[in-house]
From Swiss-Prot:
It is an enzyme of class 7 (translocase). Its EC number is 7.1.1.2. Core subunit of respiratory chain NADH dehydrogenase (Complex I) which is composed of 45 different subunits. Interacts with TMEM242. One of its GO terms (cellular component) is mitochondrial inner membrane. Core subunit of the mitochondrial membrane respiratory chain NADH dehydrogenase (Complex I) which catalyzes electron transfer from NADH through the respiratory chain, using ubiquinone as an electron acceptor. Essential for the catalytic activity and assembly of complex I. It catalyses: a ubiquinone + NADH + 5 H(+)(in) = a ubiquinol + NAD(+) + 4 H(+)(out). The chain crosses the membrane at residues 3-23, 25-45, 59-79, 96-116, 148-170, 178-198, 200-220, 247-267, 276-296, 326-346. This is NADH-ubiquinone oxidoreductase chain 2.
Length: 347
């Protein structure tokens, strides 16, 4: 892709998300979503092949449907309130429809089916944008309408997302699909605490973006897209591969890595709000995510996949790819929690 065109597309993506996050007018928010969607589609088709075309088409159809639901919710709210600006108390019907629209844009269950398929069909760099930046705008809208959100609906969707994010990743060997299901589960954790403590949702989002960005950058550095290709990297890049596996365990929420912090704080907050049953179910279901990450770590580090005897060994050479920011990102994604014990005192 022409660098000038790429810069223009990236600026449009950033502008669309910024309009959504900074506007107080519903029509401007809808326009921001549309700008963002139309600019992201060329990024998804950066590698021009049938799979990326299919992924971009699925993404467009899903996001267009969500935008129609968003406009329907805006019109219903306009009929009841008589104004285009944000109101703290939305009409219940409009609130439910808007929650469903944002859930479809984010990939919350049961509106999640497009996330693994689209992520698998695009490049790693496009997948990074899809699973990190594209979550900001829908979550900002949910953050604003959180005082009037339907509690039963959002908790049901969050519990389903955590369960499906765990079950879906169990039989996957494609790393992009594993990260897509992990994203669905993390979105479920964020949605579960949204009605009780929206600020904690932002903390969870920050840590999720940090860990996912580091994981994608490590995959881009090793050019790994499957479990098999990751296991063959031990000879070529041992340090990078071990860092990748450590960050995957952090994504799964293994203490004392930083991925454990948001889960710990969310369970604590849910318990304070007398949602003990939900917190218990979420904690048990989160073990599914941790299981497939630990299985992936075990398979790539302690065992050898069945391969042909005449397969060429990957020798270790100096890596030509620039990785200036990776050491800092790896440190932040793994040992932030042990280095900052004061975080555990936050209420």
């Amino acid at each position: 892709m022409n660098p000038l065109i790429l810069i223009m597309i990236m600026l449009t993506v950033i502008l669309g998300t910024t309009i959504v996050m900074m506007s107080s007018h519903w029509l401007m928010i809808w326009m921001g979503f549309e700008m963002n969607m139309l600019a992201v589609i060329p990024l998804l088709m950066k590698q021009y092949n049938p799979r990326s075309m299919e992924a971009a088409t699925k993404y467009f159809l899903t996001q267009a449907t969500a935008s129609m639901l968003l406009m329907l919710a805006i019109i219903i709210n306009l009929l009841y309130s008589g104004q285009w600006t944000f109101t703290k108390l939305m009409n219940p019907t409009a609130s439910i429809i808007m929650t469903l629209a944002m859930a479809m844009k984010m990939g919350l269950a049961p509106l999640h089916f497009w996330v693994p398929e689209v992520t698998q069909g695009i490049s790693l760099s496009s997948g990074l944008i899809l699973l990190t930046w594209q979550k900001l705008a829908p979550l900002s809208v949910l953050y604003v309408i959180s005082p009037g959100i339907n509690l039963d609906l959002i908790l049901l969707m969050s519990m389903m997302s955590i369960a499906i994010g765990g079950w879906g990743g169990l039989n996957q060997t494609q790393l992009r699909k594993i990260l897509a299901y992990s994203s669905i589960a993390h979105m479920g954790w964020m949605a579960s605490i949204l009605a009780f403590n929206p600020t904690m949702t932002l903390l969870n989002l920050l840590l999720y973006i940090l860990m996912t960005t580091t994981t994608f950058m490590l995959f881009m550095a090793t050019s790994a897209t499957t479990t098999l290709s990751l296991s063959h990297m031990w000879n070529k890049m041992p340090l990078i591969t071990s860092s990748t596996l450590t960050i995957m365990l952090s994504l799964g929420g293994l203490p004392p890595l930083v991925g454990f912090l948001p889960k710990w704080m969310i369970i604590q907050e849910l318990t304070k709000n007398n949602n003990i049953t939900l917190a218990t179910l979420m904690a048990i279901t989160a073990l599914l995510n941790l299981f497939f990450y630990m299985r992936l770590t075990y398979a790539t580090s302690l065992t050898m996949f069945p391969t042909m005897n005449n397969m060429k060994i990957k020798w270790q050479f100096n890596n030509k790819k620039q990785m200036k920011y990776l050491p800092m990102l790896i440190i932040l994604s793994t040992i932030t929690l042990p280095l900052a014990p004061a975080i555990t005192l936050l209420n």
